[in-house]
Every structure is written in C-alpha cells, then in structure tokens.
Amino acid sequence: GEHALQAAHLAMEEGCAANIVVASLLHDIGHMLHALPDDAPEQGIDDLHEELGFRFVDKYFKHEVAEPVRLHVAAKRYLCAKEPEYLGRLSEPSIIILHLQGGPITEAECRLFEQNPFYRDAVQLRRLDDLAKVPNMEVRPLDSYRTLLTGQLK
C-alpha cells in the first residue's frame, strides 16, 4: 500500500542498493498474508508479519531482499537498545507493538544481531520504514519498480 510505496520511494531518494529498495517495497507484505484483524496489537496479538513476509519473499526473491524483511522488527528492537533517542521518538502505538514484540533486546542479543551479514541492511530498512508515514506524500508509482523487482527475483 501507500506505506510500502513511501518506503521504497525514500530508499530511491537516498540512493539505496536495489535489494533495500525492493525490501522496502515488500517489508510489510506479511500483514496481507494473515487473517488477523487490523487492531490485533491493541488486542495483545503480535501478528509475526515479518516471519510470514520473509517466507513469501524468500520463496521468490534473493536472500539479500528476504533477510532484511525477516529482520526489520528485530532491527527496531536493536535500535531501541542501542539508541535511547530512537526509543524516545516512537509513537504510543509503536511502543505497544514494541512490547508485544519483546521490547528492546539485551546487549548480548545486540552482539548476536550484529553477526548477521544483513544487519546493516535491516537497520537501513527499519529507518526507511519509520520515515514512511507521511500523509499524502508524492511517491513513484508501483509500476516504476518493475525492473528493480525482476532484477531481485531468484
């Protein structure tokens, strides 16, 4: 939807690598793959959309697209642990969701996260995800990503 197009548009504007642009476009596809209500977080349910999204994306796209999708929630938990100002910028709904997802990770978990070769890509995707919440933003149409998308297919 609109959020995904904004994230991908911002990735293009920042000159991100193709895998990040495509991951930005697909990172929340897991929300479309489950049957949970939109207010699942308010009901105390973590929809695990990053895992559902990863399974779908990993089936069709290169690992360097799929892995940041899988890690984009972990990247939020990582940033909350590493950057107090990041945690301070989260909206009330984001804080509710953060706690459902397990809250900020420990120092040991941070070190483990940093061992993943795609952790920097995941953090970059997370920052794009956070910025892609502007009402009525002018964005590139979905069709403009066709070449990038096909280039990242398995």
Roles of regions detected by a PLM:
Residues 1-3, 9:
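A positional/architectural concept
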Residues 131-154:
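Charged phosphate-binding loop/patch that engages nucleotide di/tri-phosphates or the phosphate backbone
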Residues 8-125:
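Divalent metal-dependent catalytic cores for phosphoryl transfer on phosphate-bearing substrates
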